[in-house]
């Protein structure tokens, strides 16, 4: 993965805020971003920041393309060395069948594995989709 130049000049918080601004579709699909605490992502490594950004891009892209959602929420929380990313939508959801995932989800799984994190996916028809990524930054330093 080539590091996009923006990561040299902006923090993950700023990049995500810009992404939401660029992809928000008022009247169609609203994007909401919550950073908790907002200034606590600036010292993440570029690698971690990029992987989180790419996961957000893929997850939001899936919601915009497939879910027919009117709301997509992106929540990024950091407590000490733990980072939790949740991307959820109020779209149509899907049946979770063992072993069946689309290419987008496969890409997300690979990125989560790169971060030695865990991925939880909750979805059901008519119930929307929730994707949760949990990363322990201490695992990345070993």
Give residue ranges: language-model regions.
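Coiled-coil dimerization/phosphotransfer module
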Residues: 1-142
């Amino acid at each position: 993965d080539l590091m996009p130049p923006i990561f040299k000049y902006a923090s993950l918080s700023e990049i995500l805020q810009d992404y939401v601004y660029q992809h928000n579709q008022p009247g169609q699909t609203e994007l909401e971003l919550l950073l908790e605490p907002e200034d606590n992502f600036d010292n993440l490594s570029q690698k971690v920041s990029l992987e989180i950004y790419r996961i957000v891009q893929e997850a939001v892209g899936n919601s915009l393309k497939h879910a027919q959602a009117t709301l997509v929420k992106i929540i990024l929380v950091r407590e000490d060395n733990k980072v939790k990313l949740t991307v959820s939508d109020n779209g149509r959801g899907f049946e979770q069948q063992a072993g069946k995932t689309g290419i987008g989800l496969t890409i997300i799984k690979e990125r989560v594995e790169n971060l030695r994190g865990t991925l939880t996916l909750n979805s059901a028809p008519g119930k929307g989709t929730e994707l949760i990524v949990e990363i322990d930054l201490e695992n990345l330093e070993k």
